[in-house]
C-alpha cells in the first residue's frame, strides 16, 4: 500500500544563536487511515515536525512526500491544493475570530480557501459538531470544548 505521508532523512535547523536542529535525519512512513500522535517535552521539535509534515516549513535536507508529491519541491499552488483537500491543521490553542459568530468562523474558512460558501454545508458541519444551536454565538459565549470542536470543524471543511 502506498504511504499517505513519508519523511526521508529530514533535517530542519534554525540558525538563531546557538543553532538548533530539532529534526536531524528523521525518517518515518504514515500509511493511509492511520492516526499518529506526536508527544514529547517542550522545545524538542514537535511543532517543527508538524509544520514540516504539512509543508509550512521547508527542511534543509531530506524529502517529505504527501501522496507522492514532494512537499519540499512543491509550488505554492500545489501546497494550496493539498491544504484545501488533504492536510488540515488544528492547533493546540483554539484560534477563533472573536468578533465573528460560530457560523461566521466556519464561513470564513471556506471563503479563505476560495470555495463557494454553501450555507447548508456550514450548518451540516455545525450539526455534526453539536453546535447547530450555537451558530449565532460569539466564541466568548462558547465553552472551551465547544471552541475546540469549532476549530476542528473549520479544519474539516
Regions found by a protein language model. Give the residues of each.
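Short coil-to-helix segment of the ABC ATPase nucleotide-binding domain corresponding to the Q-loop/switch region
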Residues: 100-108
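ABC ATPase NBD coupling module
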Residues: 20, 71-88
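The feature captures the beta-strand-to-loop junction immediately N-terminal to the Walker
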Residues: 39-41
Amino acid at each position: 500500500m502506498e504511504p499517505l505521508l513519508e519523511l526521508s532523512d529530514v533535517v530542519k535547523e534554525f540558525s538563531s544563536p546557538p543553532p538548533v536542529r530539532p529534526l536531524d535525519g528523521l525518517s518515518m512512513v504514515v500509511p493511509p487511515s492511520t492516526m499518529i500522535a506526536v508527544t514529547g517535552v517542550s522545545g524538542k521539535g514537535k511543532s517543527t515536525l508538524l509544520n514540516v509534515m504539512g509543508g509550512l516549513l521547508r527542511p534543509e535536507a531530506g524529502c517529505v512526500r504527501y501522496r507522492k508529491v514532494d512537499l519540499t519541491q512543491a509550488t505554492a499552488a500545489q501546497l494550496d491544493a493539498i491544504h484545501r483537500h488533504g492536510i488540515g491543521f488544528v492547533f493546540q490553542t483554539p484560534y477563533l475570530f472573536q468578533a465573528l459568530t460560530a457560523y461566521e468562523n466556519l464561513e470564513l474558512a471556506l471563503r479563505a480557501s476560495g470555495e463557494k460558501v454553501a450555507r447548508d454545508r456550514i450548518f451540516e458541519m455545525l450539526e455534526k459538531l453539536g453546535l447547530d444551536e450555537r451558530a449565532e454565538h460569539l466564541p466568548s459565549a462558547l465553552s472551551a470544548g465547544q471552541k475546540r470542536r469549532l476549530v476542528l470543524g473549520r479544519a474539516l471543511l
